[in-house]
């Protein structure tokens, strides 16, 4: 077994030409820090797949930690609302991750729609996100980078959480993690304020931001810097106070300042007038300042907003 195989608990292919040649690359789907994602076809089955080519020159060991993390996590979790890792190939100095192919992500779906998601469609998407996330959290996985571009959507609005490169397994007590995670607009306030002992609640904040974005057709908190992001949040939810009913303990966070402007906030019903009472209630519980009071994915699935769901 290779080093990567030992780390992921799976025997990997090690440069066998026939294994690599099984996949015919068609076109580029995207490019990131560690490599390129292609649309490809499995010659053996005719199945369209997503082939992520990872460069192996980013660490002393050769394999980027984000790639190791993604492989090891996806080997542990299998769920209809989590993207399926089909194969792993290590060949020619590169690591290839073969995923099921889904032709849209939620960001593209929003752009194509040109407006908000409503009714059963919105409810189905949020429910599936919570199903996938609840499964992750039960298996002690915090995704840490939930955003529309990392959520795949099929033509029938089936949702699959993808891109686990930043994900970490969590234990109790919580480990100290870097706060440089999660795309700014979906980043939880405790991370923005320098908290390093964070919990799965950071994912629930991100889900709340995504929920609001789908419901209004545009980003809820659109900051252009960390402080700008905080102020965007404060203007909607009010500047948090270190007190019961707001965010007890917030003033002890490393980047909290007493001189923050004091905004009173505005009702979520005003920000999202198309949502009914149950939907606003669920969203408000996802966007609680205090992570200890933020609703969990498991509890959110039992919320009254889903009581009439027929999916």
From Swiss-Prot:
- Tell me the GO molecular function terms: ATP binding; cyclin binding; cyclin-dependent protein serine/threonine kinase activity; protein serine kinase activity; protein serine/threonine kinase activity
Q: What is the protein's known function?
A: Probably involved in the control of the cell cycle.
Its Gene Ontology cellular component terms are: cyclin-dependent protein kinase holoenzyme complex; cytoplasm; nucleus
Q: Which residues carry this modification: Phosphothreonine?
A: 33
User: Subunit info?
Assistant: Forms a stable but non-covalent complex with a regulatory subunit and with a cyclin.
Q: What class of enzyme is it?
A: transferase
Q: Any keyword Disulfide bond?
A: no
Its recorded name reads Cell division control protein 2 homolog 3
